[in-house]
Every structure is written in C-alpha cells, then in structure tokens.
Amino acid sequence: MRKVVLIATIFVAMGATAQTPKEWRDSISVLIQQLDQSPNSIDLRLKKAEANINLGQYDYAINEYSKVLKQDDKNLAAMYFRAFCHTQLRHYDMARADYEAFLTIQPEHLEAHLGLAHVLQLLGRKTDATDELNRCVLLFPDSADAYAARAAHETQLQQYDAALYDWDEALRLKPSDASLAASKADVLIKMEKWRDARQTLDNAVKQGTPRTALKEWYDKLK
C-alpha cells in the first residue's frame, strides 16, 4: 500500500540544495552568531529551524518556531513546520492544534489538510480522519495525492471497494505513477481478484514501469 509521505518542503523554500550534516551544523553556528546580533529576526529563526530539521533536531526547531509565533502569531511557515516537528516527536495533540490553527488562516492548503488527517489517524480518530480526507478530495478534486491519501486510509480500514475507486481516480490523474498502480493491485490481491490485479500491473509495465519494480506484487499472484 502506498504510504503518503509528508515532506517538510512544501510551504516555503527550505533550501533546495543538498547539504552535509557538517554544513548544516556550520550554518547553525553562523545563524546563532547572527541571532545574537538580531534576536528579533524572524527570517534568521526560520533558517535556523530549517537547519535543525535537516539534522533531526526537532525540539530545537520547535523552540525556534515558538519564538517566531510569539512575535507573529499568524506566521504560517512557523505554524506548519512546528506541526511537522511535533508529528516527528509524536506530540500528536500539539501537531493537531497547529494544523488546525494553520487551516483556520489558510483553509485551502492541501498538505496541511493531509498533515492533519495523518495526525488524526495516529491519534486513532478514524472518523475524524475520514472526514478530513473527504474534505481534501472535495477541495482538491484534481489532486492525485488527495485521492491516494483517502485510498490508503480506506485500505487500512479494509474498505476495499471505496479504496479501489480512489486508487482509480488517483491513477486517472497520474496514470504513469507506478506506486499508485502497485497500491491498486495490492487491494485487488487482498480481494483475491487475481486477474484484475495482473491487468493493473501489466498496464503499469506498458506505461514504462520496469517489471522488476513490481516483482513483489507479481509474486503474490496465483
């Protein structure tokens, strides 16, 4: 089943160039010196939090985002990425609060809706997660990610007919996405619809996916 991965790069540009851990640590050292001179600089704090995230220092990043939000309680970048960091640290209630606050200000932001739905799933609030994913599809009917997220949730709930519909919609929007095809095939295999599963995999191969990349699912076919 396809896992919808939430990557902390979707609201503001957080540095597109790859850096080594040493380079990130060096960046932090420089930013700390700059913050000593300009402690009220929101831009510097956001940059330091970015470096903290890239080093997996989520507590430090949360601290920086919290300082930003004390200065600007509607700073969307700080709100969104603090929610992301809380999720990484399994502070799910706090992540939920940040996502909900973010969406109050910016209600049409797909990744924040998906982030909130993910947190609701982690909190075991299945009905609330379903409602949030339904909202995603209504707000973003042209997003394959919205359909895929709902399909993944439905698959977990063993609502296979509903999941198949959503995997089909996701594939309609991204027909060459091999992970979507594999996810649909996985559901068909669970339903013991072997022929349909094989056809789904074969279609993915025709779209250009190497057969070896789908070996795991081909091996499950009877």
Where are these regions (language model features)?
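A conserved position within tetratricopeptide repeats
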Residues: 31-36, 69, 103, 137, ...
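Helix-start (N-cap) detector for alpha-helical repeat units in TPR-like alpha-solenoids
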Residues: 42-43, 76-77, 110-111, 144-145, ...
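Sec-dependent N-terminal signal peptides
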Residues: 4-13
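Terminal, low-structured helical/coil segments at or just beyond the last alpha-helical repeat
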Residues: 22-25, 186, 190-222
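Structural signature of tandem alpha-helical TPR/SEL1-like repeats
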Residues: 21-30, 56-67, 89-101, 123-135, ...
